[in-house]
Amino acid sequence: TRQMVNELNYAFNLMKDADSLGSIMKFNLSDSTRLLVKQTVEFWERETAIPEIIQEQMSAFRLILALTDTYSTLVMNPPYLESGNMNSILSLYVNENYKTGKNDLFTTFMLLAINLLQSNGKFGMINMDTWVYKSSFIGIREYILENTNIDSMLMLGARTFEELSGEVVQNVCFCITNSAPYNSGLYLNVSTANTCENKHQLFNSERNKLIEI
């Protein structure tokens, strides 16, 4: 149908910017168009001889399916990139499609994770802790607090990884459920420990005293 053609044309045009956008691309396919893509992939995967032009399209079709599916569980360590350092293609797309998470690419991925989750699905993520307290991230904080449930949060601070020796990158990891808030969550701060090993030891010694707010 014309709708299917238009949706697939949009998807393939969007993928021309895949080097800049990666997995934050939104294809917005109708159920019927997605089913067509799925059936096409399944058909050619059963064939022993696949024309070269089809082979070239199969990876694109698989990407479309992956980014239009929903998941019960996701685990992410997203890229960090402040909005001011994004190229024009990425900046425009994030502003138009992930406005609440536009401050940094890692907050964009927080919204992406929620979009990809099934109802009551969960995602775990480690990223920079700036979204937890900086005023410029109030939009993403409000969205998370109002629309999801924070199951647990671990404030890691600096030197989370042995290869990161400075104070610039300070981390937090957390687990979130894609549902309306239903409990207060568990919280632990190990940021006072100054090495990766010390954080691990502090976590093990304190985990039975997790703070429930």
Whereabouts are the PLM-identified features?
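Class I S-adenosyl-L-methionine-dependent methyltransferase module
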Residues: 1-69, 73
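Signature of N6-adenine DNA methyltransferases within the class I
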Residues: 65-213
